[in-house]
């Protein structure tokens, strides 16, 4: 839809270095049907900021070109096209546009309600949450209520969105018990993943596989949240993990994540 803005920004190394390209694609691990151009986050942020300020010419299905005067109009166009027709980078930029425009909280949440269901990749989800600085400024009770339906979803990245957003916004002393209680209520076996689980490392990038228990990206999201909580509230986090109903594999991922982080590598995880 806006790929004509993006093609010139693809780095030459991604185009010409097969090993580098394979590494980039392996890190993102997009589903096979999601095309990846090869942009990095700084370039996507730059495009989103430019579109937010000045709008863009978008190409709709049927080669129809439409001049959008604002970032909000571009978002509306994203909402109207089949999400599977978008490049990975376009899905990231869509979320960045929701974050960087000047909107009311109600407008953002309306846009976000359309955006979260198209998340199909950890990087799309996490890039959005990491840049949603507006979430830190809204009423916490209001935002917490908004997240609850996503926690209850049966779709992997809708649940991961709720987890990562909670990690970014609610790991505070007065909210910690609420976050832990919500995490402990997750029914991992009821969450559906589009990724296949395999026992060995995928032979090539973008095969739609993960080498762990499904839904891997929800389990890893919980592990990441807990490792972050450990850095801030070590005793309360250990107490929660020891008394929780979390699956053993999630606890193992949490311990591994804690050991890998420079903030918690010397902190007892359990």
Q: What is each of the regions a protein language model found here?
A:
Residues 1-270:
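Alpha-helical scaffold domains
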């Amino acid at each position: 839809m806006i790929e004509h803005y993006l093609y010139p920004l693809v780095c030459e190394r991604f185009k010409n270095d097969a090993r580098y390209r394979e590494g980039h694609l392996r890190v993102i691990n997009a589903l096979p049907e999601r095309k990846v151009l090869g942009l990095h986050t700084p370039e996507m942020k730059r495009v989103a900021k430019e579109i937010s300020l000045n709008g863009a010419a978008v190409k709709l299905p049927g080669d129809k070109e439409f001049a959008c005067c604002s970032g909000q109009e571009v978002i509306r166009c994203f909402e109207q096209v089949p999400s599977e027709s978008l490049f990975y980078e376009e899905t990231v930029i869509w979320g960045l546009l929701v974050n960087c425009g000047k909107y009311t909280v109600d407008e953002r949440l309306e846009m976000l309600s359309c955006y979260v269901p198209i998340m199909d990749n950890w990087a799309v989800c996490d890039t959005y949450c990491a840049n949603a600085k507006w979430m830190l400024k809204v009423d916490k009770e209001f935002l917490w209520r908004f997240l609850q339906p996503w926690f209850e979803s049966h779709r992997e990245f809708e649940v991961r969105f709720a987890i990562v957003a909670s990690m970014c916004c609610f790991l505070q002393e007065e909210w910690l018990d609420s976050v832990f209680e919500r995490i402990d209520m997750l029914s991992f076996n009821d969450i559906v993943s589009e990724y296949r689980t395999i026992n060995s490392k995928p032979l090539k990038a973008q095969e739609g596989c993960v080498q762990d228990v499904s839904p891997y990206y929800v389990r890893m999201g919980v592990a990441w949240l807990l490792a972050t909580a450990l850095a801030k509230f070590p005793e309360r986090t250990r107490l929660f993990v020891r008394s929780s109903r979390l699956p053993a594999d999630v606890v193992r991922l949490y311990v591994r994540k804690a050991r890998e982080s420079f903030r918690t590598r010397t902190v007892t995880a359990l």
